[in-house]
């Protein structure tokens, strides 16, 4: 059918006069249904239709106003000012016919009988004096508040006509409350029926105009938008608001994509910045009947003032808009749970430099009141609980304010996805969402937010009430590896500080022997709703599954080829659903401890390959070989935090270092021997014997089960000597009865920054036969692991010399802090001394080939290890143009894991690994630091350290 509000204005053109991209946002299949909304027969004597756009009170086009006066015989000798908002009051017979034509239009559209001209004219005050008419017109022209007198007539009108009249009055009141209205365009979008479809159009509707937006108003009149859900893919801003019934705004339309704001090009050309669309509802109804759109010429942080003015104006005409649900009264248990959530979010934000963390609560709408505890359902919405949120970066407060004004539904954003799946959900870039998937994405783009993770928790305080925590990673962290490391660290921090918060587990999951509360990996494709509080998994520090990688196990992701987490290890997911992972989960559950023990003597890789083959053959299905990461996860489930053979290799390397030192001791005939059974040095043999692998495994395995170390398998890069010696944690030097007793003497200060153990005697009056004039230079790794530096000699305790100094790499606290003491022996001195040592070939002094990668760039150069770790950082920084202290290096070790390189001791360890592998080249990964290195010993902060 023809649009009943078709314009009769000449000079405004029709759809054929404009490019097709300006028409509307409907799909191509609706093109045939869209009629020409502007007719060419404006001079048709049988119809004197004139819409609101023709009224001088609301239209600012000079040509249109001239036509208006000419058509109805009005004098246009005195030009109408267009620089301000004006009103045109009906005051003469011909003007009355203009008004009558509008009501004729309304009556015709809704099937009412048209009133006769005589009946219409009798209801208006007319003047036969042309001078009086002219004077009244001049008087009205100078007024700023525009609301025509036609609204005072008493002709019966239809409901739709009443809505138009109300919107005119509401715009008038809005202009009064907002001042001059400078820099504002306000226009109303109402549904019209075109064929079998309803479209939103602002043509022939009331509007409020600033002159600078006249062209944009003309463009808007030529657009139509979908008024029904699923009618088209791109409903545009008015369409989205009409369908959802929720206000939507942006401080700048540039934060929209082109298909989200279909008039983007025209908005840019006309300097449109801020925009808000407000749904209009009848006072007694809940369905949206119109949309009011406001655009501004200035970028606005929010539309609070405009929203308040519009609400008051609508209330005055018995209309309303959708209100933001206010929170219900919180019980004491809810306040306790929210207080703990805020403490957790505050700690996490400070420790890991997160910009902000939000807490969402599922609610239902009950007369504009949020009622928490609502389960998944049709009326469920997710609302921000402001009292539990924490903003670490004050610039992000505007984003929190925007979230407060907009509730999310199920499946919207990572919060909605985490809510329905009971699984943590991760997005590497929330800005990439479409506005239909994440309704506040325009605000996320404004503040530059990137990666975020959401997790659903419950509290023992509130039973089955759900809380969804949304954590935003630092905006500068865009690399997948950086995000992986931070998520692992986040997991450990949250497990340590959460007291009553619990994650929701899958209903019906069977508890296996040895299973403790914690985050477990499970099938991501099916997560039924939890029905009992017993189906919780407590985040507990003393849990057997408190690995820093288990927090986000089984986490889902938003895109293909994006980062996903499986038991804490981020991997590149080549498919959203991989059938082999289900088989892998079943296979993992059937690897027993006895099966693992049979492979302890071999390497981790060989054991993974062997166990995978055996298991798949047992099940006679889908040949699968475990990767080392999978086997590590299985070991942790059995309480094995480190593969035993690697411990033995570490012990042997350390003992070889000790043997090098002992062989250089003067005055001990035949050298010293370290007895692994007693933990003592015995001067009976000229060499030290490596620990037998099988014998060492039996003792270390029992010790490992008893200790239940808190460290992850790949993170444990330190060697604890006390695992291979007696309980007293001391080194005993048992001298032979023929040896002289040690006499007091002076000791030379030595460098302990991770170099091989050295015994050095200072020049003094005592010769070698008089006693041992040396000092034990303890490795920084052993000291940081809590080893007692006290040295026992012949049953008497000898404290280390007070002048002794060392460089300690505090890798145990995860901060990578370097605490350096004074040292009189440098790396160069040690290298000079090493050249005279018979065992110098073990460490090697050949040139090292370095291959470093930073983001998309890779460099290769030769490096002399003797210059030390600081020089290596300088060489890498010089090639990538990075400042000192702004990046960190990690090298690929013999188990293909990335290990931090911070100090010279780390470099020496790297060289030894390369020597054992027979290689002379090393790969380095360069990663940016979000904060300078350094923290207190007890800090759990994420300050650039990795696994």
Swiss-Prot record:
**What PROSITE patterns would the database entry show?**
PB1, RWP_RK
Gene Ontology annotations for the cellular component aspect, listed alphabetically: nucleus
Q: Where does this one sit in the cell?
A: Nucleus
Query: Which residues span the membrane?
Result: none
RWP-RK domain segment(s): 577-671
Could you tell me which CDD domains the record lists for this protein? PB1_NLP
Biased composition range(s): Polar residues? 522-533, 550-572
Instruction: Give the record's GO biological process terms.
Output: regulation of DNA-templated transcription
Q: Keywords, A to Z?
A: Coiled coil, DNA-binding, Nucleus, Transcription, Transcription regulation
Give every PB1 domain span. 847-929
A family per Pfam: PB1
SUPFAM superfamilies according to UniProt: CAD & PB1 domains (SSF54277)
Task: Report the GO molecular function annotations.
Answer: DNA binding; DNA-binding transcription factor activity
Which domain of life does the UniProt lineage start with?
Answer: Eukaryota
Q: In what ranges is there compositional bias, type Basic and acidic residues?
A: 126-135, 573-587
Q: Which intervals of the chain form a coiled coil?
A: 646-666
Q: Where is this region: Disordered?
A: 114-135, 509-533, 550-591, 805-828
Its main localization is: nucleus
Q: Where is the composition biased (Low complexity)?
A: 805-815
Give a short account of what the protein does: Probable transcription factor.
The name under which this protein is listed is Protein NLP8
């Amino acid at each position: 059918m023809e649009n009943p509000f078709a314009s009769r204005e000449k000079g405004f053109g029709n759809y054929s006069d404009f490019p097709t991209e300006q028409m509307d946002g409907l799909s191509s299949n609706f093109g045939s249904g869209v009629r020409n909304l502007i007719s060419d027969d404006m001079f048709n004597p049988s119809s004197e239709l004139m819409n609101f756009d023709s009224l001088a009170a609301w239209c600012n086009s000079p040509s249109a106003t001239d036509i208006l006066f000419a058509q109805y015989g009005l004098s246009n000798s005195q030009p109408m000012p267009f620089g301000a908002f004006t009103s045109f009051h009906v005051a003469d017979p011909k003007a009355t016919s203009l008004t009558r034509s509008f009501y004729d239009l309304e009556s015709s559209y809704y099937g009412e009988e048209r009133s006769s001209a005589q009946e219409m004219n009798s209801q208006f005050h007319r003047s036969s004096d042309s001078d009086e008419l002219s004077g009244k017109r001049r008087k009205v022209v100078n007024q700023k508040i525009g609301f025509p007198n036609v609204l005072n007539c008493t002709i019966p009108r239809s409901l739709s006509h009443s809505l138009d009249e109300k919107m005119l009055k509401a715009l008038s009141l809005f202009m009064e409350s907002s001042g001059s209205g400078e820099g504002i365009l306000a226009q109303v979008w109402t549904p019209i029926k075109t064929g079998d479809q309803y479209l939103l159009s602002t043509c022939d509707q009331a509007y409020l105009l600033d002159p600078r937006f006249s062209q944009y108003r003309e463009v808007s009149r030529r657009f139509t938008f979908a008024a029904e859900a699923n009618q088209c893919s791109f409903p545009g801003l008015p369409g989205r608001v009409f369908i959802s019934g929720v206000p939507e705004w942006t401080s700048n339309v540039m934060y929209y994509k082109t298909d989200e704001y279909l008039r983007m090009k025209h908005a840019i050309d006309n300097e449109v910045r801020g925009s808000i669309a407000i749904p209009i509802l009848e006072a007694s109804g809940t369905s949206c009947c119109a949309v009011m759109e406001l655009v501004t010429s200035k970028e606005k942080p929010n539309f609070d003032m405009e929203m308040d003015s519009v609400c008051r104006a609508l209330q005055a005409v018995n209309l309303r808009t959708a209100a933001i649900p206010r929170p219900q009264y919180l019980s004491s248990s809810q306040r306790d749970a929210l207080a703990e959530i805020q403490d957790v979010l505050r700690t996490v934000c400070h420790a890991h430099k997160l910009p902000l963390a939000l807490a969402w609560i599922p609610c239902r709408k009950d007369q504009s009141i949020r009622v928490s505890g609502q389960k998944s359902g049709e009326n469920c919405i997710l609302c921000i609980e402001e009292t539990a949120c924490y903003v670490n970066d004050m610039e992000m407060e505007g984003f929190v304010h925007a979230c407060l004004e907009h509730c999310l539904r199920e499946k919207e954003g990572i919060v909605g996805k985490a809510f329905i799946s009971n699984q943590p959900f991760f997005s590497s870039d929330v800005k990439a969402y479409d506005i239909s998937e994440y309704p506040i994405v325009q605000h996320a783009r404004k503040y530059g937010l990137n990666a975020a993770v959401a997790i659903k928790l419950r509290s023992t305080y509130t039973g089955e009430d759900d809380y969804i925590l949304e954590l935003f990673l630092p905006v500068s962290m865009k690399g997948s590896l950086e995000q992986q490391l931070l998520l692992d660290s986040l997991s450990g921090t949250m497990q340590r500080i959460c007291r009553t918060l619990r994650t929701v587990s899958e209903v019906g999951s069977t508890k296996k022997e040895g299973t403790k509360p914690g985050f477990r990996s499970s099938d991501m494709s099916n997560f039924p709703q939890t029905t009992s509080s017993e189906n919780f998994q407590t985040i507990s520090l003393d849990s057997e599954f408190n690995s820093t990688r288990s927090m986000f196990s089984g986490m889902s992701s938003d895109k293909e080829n994006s980062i996903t987490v499986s038991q804490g290890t981020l991997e590149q997911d080549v498919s959203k659903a991989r059938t082999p992972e289900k088989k892998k989960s079943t296979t993992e559950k059937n690897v027993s401890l006895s099966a693992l023990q049979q492979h302890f003597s071999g390497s981790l890789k060989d054991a993974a390959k062997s166990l995978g083959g055996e298991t798949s053959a047992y099940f006679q299905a889908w040949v699968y070989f475990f990767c080392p990461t999978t086997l590590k996860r299985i070991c942790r489930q059995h309480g094995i935090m480190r593969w035993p053979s690697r411990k033995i290799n570490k012990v042997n390397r350390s003992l070889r270092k000790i043997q090098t030192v002992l062989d250089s001791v003067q005055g001990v005939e035949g050298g010293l021997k370290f007895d692994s059974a007693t933990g003592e040095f015995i001067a009976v043999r000229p060499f030290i014997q490596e620990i037998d692998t099988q014998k060492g495994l039996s003792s270390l395995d029992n010790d490992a089960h008893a200790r239940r170390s808190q460290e992850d398998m790949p993170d444990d890069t330190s060697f604890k000597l006390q695992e291979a010696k007696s309980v007293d944690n001391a080194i005993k030097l048992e001298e032979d009865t023929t040896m002289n007793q040690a006499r007091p003497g002076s000791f030379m200060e030595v460098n302990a920054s991770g170099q091989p153990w050295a015994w050095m005697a200072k020049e003094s009056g005592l010769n070698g036969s008089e006693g041992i004039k040396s000092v034990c230079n303890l490795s920084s790794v052993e000291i940081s692991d809590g080893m007692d530096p006290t040295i026992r000699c012949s049953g008497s305790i000898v404290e280390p010399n007070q002048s002794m100094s060392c460089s300690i790499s505090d890798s145990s606290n995860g901060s990578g802090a370097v605490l350096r003491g004074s040292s009189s022996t440098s790396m160069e001195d040690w290298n000079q001394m090493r050249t005279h040592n018979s065992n110098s070939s073990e460490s090697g002094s050949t040139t090292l080939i370095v291959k470093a990668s930073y983001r998309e760039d890779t460099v290769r150069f030769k490096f002399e290890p003797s210059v030390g770790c600081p020089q290596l950082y300088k060489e890498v920084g010089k090639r990538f143009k990075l400042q000192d202290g702004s990046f960190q290096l990690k090298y690929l070790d013999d188990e293909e894991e990335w290990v931090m390189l911070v100090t010279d001791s780390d470099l020496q360890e790297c060289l030894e690994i390369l020597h054992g592998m027979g290689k002379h080249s090393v790969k380095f990964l360069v990663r940016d630091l979000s904060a300078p290195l350094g923290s207190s010993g007890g800090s759990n902060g994420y300050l650039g350290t990795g696994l």
